[in-house]
């Protein structure tokens, strides 16, 4: 109170409270740039028009045709992701020796993983990604009406089960990505894989049909122009689902129980050289691991050992 003028000078306490820390936090967040990272695994058997072995081998008569198609469709997905706000994009070349894509066609913002052998093979380096997309994927071994049906190693593996479920390469890789909290949001490939596995195990993932097979070496595919449009809109839908939080990682339980059926007893004999492998049949073995990534590594090692045995026996 200013007694000289009769004026009340007492400061009134504001009814509004000021949280300085909350204000600072909000101010900082308003300037934070969120970097989104996508991971693309590219196989070849599920690509359109691939119907003969000559499409799939480095010295195959039609190999260059498939390289161009796979690169072209990969670029469609890469560009669609970039337009949707993904600044970091990793492409994993994932067929055979894993040196198939035409590197000179890839934009500067893409990092390419290529070469084999490598950890977790088809999903090397997936950790730290926000989303994963699989292109050119095919059905598992023993699937009817599916071109080049096989599971990872067509020459040695008859069937692979993880925790009692027979898996395709799609499911093997999806479990591995899920272990590091990465959801698969789009799969493009053979119709039979999309129906048998993708729709069943990851119903939230966009499914883009690149081919519909009449058998192991015959299939029908739309024109490239239509496929490019399908992939473009598919990526847009998949990213929208991700941003709306309607996608999720697919995680298998641990410990991981693996059952493996080889195509002959030579391979099962060889696998028993590892102490953690238990023989349960003429062609059958099983093992248990603490993590999905560990299961993948042992499985991959057994496939490589089988390939070595096959080469040795071929020369005898």
Regions found by a protein language model. Give the residues of each.
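A glycine-rich helix N-cap at a beta->alpha junction
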Residues: 109-125
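Short beta-strand segments
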Residues: 41-42, 92-93, 132-137, 187-188, ...
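C-terminal accessory domains and tails appended to enzymatic cores
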Residues: 213, 227-316
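Active-site rim beta-loop-alpha module in soluble metabolic enzymes
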Residues: 176-239
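Extreme N-terminal starter segment of soluble prokaryotic enzymes
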Residues: 35-39
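Short catalytic helix/loop segments, enriched in acidic residues and glycine
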Residues: 55-79
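Active-site glycine-rich loop that binds ribose-phosphate moieties when present
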Residues: 117-118, 154-180, 189-193
């Amino acid at each position: 109170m200013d007694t000289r003028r009769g004026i009340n000078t007492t400061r009134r306490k504001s009814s509004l409270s000021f949280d300085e820390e909350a204000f600072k936090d909000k101010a900082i967040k308003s300037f934070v740039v969120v970097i989104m990272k996508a991971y693309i695994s590219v196989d070849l058997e599920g690509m359109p028009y691939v119907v003969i072995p000559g499409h799939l081998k480095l010295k195959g008569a039609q190999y260059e045709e498939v390289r161009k198609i796979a690169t072209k469709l990969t670029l469609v997905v890469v560009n669609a992701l970039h337009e949707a706000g993904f600044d970091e994009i990793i492409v994993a070349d994932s067929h055979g020796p894993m040196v198939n894509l035409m590197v000179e066609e890839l934009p500067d913002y893409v990092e390419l993983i290529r070469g084999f052998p490598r950890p977790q093979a088809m999903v090397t380096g997936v950790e730290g990604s926000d989303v994963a997309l699989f292109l050119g994927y095919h059905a598992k071994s023993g699937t009817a009406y599916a071109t080049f049906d096989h599971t990872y190693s067509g020459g040695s593996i008859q069937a692979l089960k993880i925790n009692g479920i027979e898996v395709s390469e799609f499911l093997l890789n999806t479990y591995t990505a899920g272990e590091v909290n990465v959801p698969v949001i789009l799969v493009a490939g053979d119709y039979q894989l999309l129906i048998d596995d993708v729709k069943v195990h990851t119903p939230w993932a966009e499914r883009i049909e690149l081919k519909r097979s009449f058998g192991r070496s015959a299939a029908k595919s739309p024109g490239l122009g239509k496929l490019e449009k399908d992939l473009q809109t598919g990526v847009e839908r998949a990213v929208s689902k991700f941003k709306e939080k309607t996608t999720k990682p697919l995680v298998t339980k641990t410990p991981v129980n693996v059952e493996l059926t080889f195509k002959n007893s030579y391979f099962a004999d060889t696998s028993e050289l590892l102490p953690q492998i238990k023989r349960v049949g003429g062609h059958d073995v099983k093992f248990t691991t603490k993590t999905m990534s560990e299961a993948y590594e042992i499985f991959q090692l057994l496939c490589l050992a089988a390939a070595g045995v096959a080469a040795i026996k071929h020369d005898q």
